[in-house]
């Protein structure tokens, strides 16, 4: 009988003051140095572009399935967890995972990918003064399952994966063990990650990310008021609306994509990019999401005086069963009886049965807490006679990024902040 590996992914985030992971911690412009045997290097900008490509590809799949719902997830959390699985995958199973994560295996060898992730996660685990970040992996292994020592050692060395034994025949106790661990690691933000646990389960892989930061320019709670938010054709909903006046912050108006882009910075090396499509233009902006678009926006941002900025205060969450979505990105074999995960047990007796991802994003006055060129025209404020007022009173996108590497650990669409 084929045993099942249940892969659980977790992510939590808040968006008012926050930090991002990758290079905010890196003082170098590469994620890892040249290997003694190979001359291949994966620089941070390339890794950021690859991560962004995966993020936008997955986002489009999730948004298409839920066009009138909030979307929030951590592409970094998901890719790191799948990369751990790829450590034990062989042949086509391994290639599908890494290529599904948008890596080009002819340009970047598998060993360099793992080394890059390992270096990144190691840097992220270092304590920060201005931002709280916690990220890691945990393996919950059926006590009767024999896992190769080499796999456990690599998972621990590269991905800081802790290993625990569990009795999945006692599903209630095993579920509590895992959920309690996740709750503790995410400061209580993620509760009940696993709701169902099959008795055939042999292993559960949990990835978590938690971060908390503060806005560089915080909102004054005394200025927050009830205002209307317009979600499509529905009647507007009342939401707490935060307000900033006379704010100097990076801004650009994209005339080609019909959207406004504003960057709000956190204390530390992180920022949140808010993309506000014009009325009825959300699908146009979503269809154009790709690494080049994000790069163009960031290159075009200029410090500008915004007379009034309105942003809803919100807390949103989402749960995803990604085993139904990842095959659309080319990751198929690991979910079938053709899966080759022999690098985990030494036998081809494992397959992935479930990939669960849960994200929480809170945006408030003080900050964010988490447990996730052509056509771009900058309009100089000196040329504007009318005051610049930007109101996020309709669906918008939010991308949390590291300001040094441009990696986006969290991506969200706020369709209804209430």
Curated annotation (Swiss-Prot):
Expression induction or repression: By acute inflammation.
InterPro entries listed in its UniProt record: Serpin_CS, Serpin_dom, Serpin_fam, Serpin_sf, Serpin_sf_1, Serpin_sf_2
UniProt keyword annotation of Phosphoprotein present: yes
Superkingdom assignment: Eukaryota
Gene Ontology CC: one annotated term: extracellular region
Record PTM: N-glycosylated.
GO biological process: cellular response to cAMP; cellular response to glucocorticoid stimulus; cellular response to interleukin-1; cellular response to interleukin-6; cellular response to type II interferon; response to bacterium; response to cytokine; response to lipopolysaccharide
Modification Phosphoserine occurs at: 93
Molecular-function annotations in GO: serine-type endopeptidase inhibitor activity
Signal peptide: 1-29
Free-text comment on this protein's domains from its UniProt entry: The reactive center loop (RCL) extends out from the body of the protein and directs binding to the target protease. The protease cleaves the serpin at the reactive site within the RCL, establishing a covalent linkage between the serpin reactive site and the protease. The resulting inactive serpin-protease complex is highly stable. Variability within the reactive center loop (RCL) sequences of Serpina3 paralogs may determine target protease specificity.
Miscellaneous notes: The single human alpha1-antichymotrypsin gene (SERPINA3) is represented by a cluster of 6 individual rat paralogs.
Name under which the protein is recorded: Serine protease inhibitor A3N
């Amino acid at each position: 009988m084929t045993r099942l590996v249940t892969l659980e992914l977790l992510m939590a985030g808040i968006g008012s003051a926050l930090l991002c992971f990758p290079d905010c911690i890196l003082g170098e412009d590469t994620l890892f140095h040249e290997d003694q045997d190979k001359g291949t290097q994966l620089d941070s900008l390339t890794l950021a572009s690859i991560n962004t490509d995966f993020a936008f590809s997955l986002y489009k799949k999730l948004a298409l399935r839920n066009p009138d719902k909030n979307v929030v997830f951590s592409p970094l959390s998901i890719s790191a967890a799948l990369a751990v699985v790829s450590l034990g995958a062989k042949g086509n199973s391994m290639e599908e995972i890494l290529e599904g994560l948008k890596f080009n295996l002819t340009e970047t060898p598998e060993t360099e990918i793992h080394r890059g992730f390992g270096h990144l996660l190691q840097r992220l685990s270092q304590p920060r003064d201005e931002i709280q970040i916690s990220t890691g992996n945990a393996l919950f292994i059926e006590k009767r399952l024999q896992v190769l020592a080499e796999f456990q050692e690599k998972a621990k060395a590269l991905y800081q994966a802790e290993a625990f034994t569990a009795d999945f025949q006692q599903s209630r106790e095993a579920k509590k063990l895992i959920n309690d661990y996740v709750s503790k690691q995410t400061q209580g933000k993620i509760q009940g990650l696993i709701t169902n646990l099959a008795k055939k389960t042999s292993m559960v892989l949990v990835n978590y990310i938690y971060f908390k930061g503060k806005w560089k320019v915080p909102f004054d709670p005394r200025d927050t008021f009830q205002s209307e938010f317009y979600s499509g054709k529905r009647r507007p909903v009342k939401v707490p609306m935060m307000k900033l006046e006379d704010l100097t912050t990076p801004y650009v108006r994209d005339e080609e994509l019909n959207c406004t882009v504003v960057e709000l910075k956190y204390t530390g090396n992180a920022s949140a990019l808010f993309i506000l499509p014009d009325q009825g233009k959300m699908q146009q902006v979503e269809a154009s999401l790709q690494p080049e678009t994000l790069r163009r926006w960031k290159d075009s941002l200029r410090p500008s005086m915004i007379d009034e900025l309105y942003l809803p205060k919100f807390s949103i969450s989402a749960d995803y069963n990604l085993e139904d979505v990842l095959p659309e990105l080319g990751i198929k074999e690991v979910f079938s009886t053709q899966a080759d995960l022999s690098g985990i047990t030494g036998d081809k007796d494992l397959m992935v049965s479930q990939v669960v991802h849960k994200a929480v994003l809170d945006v408030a006055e003080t900050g964010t807490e988490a447990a996730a060129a052509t056509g771009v025209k900058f309009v100089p404020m000196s040329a504007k006679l009318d005051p610049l007022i930007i109101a996020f009173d309709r669906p918008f996108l939010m991308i949390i990024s590291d300001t040094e590497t441009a990696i986006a650990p969290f991506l969200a669409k706020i369709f209804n902040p209430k």
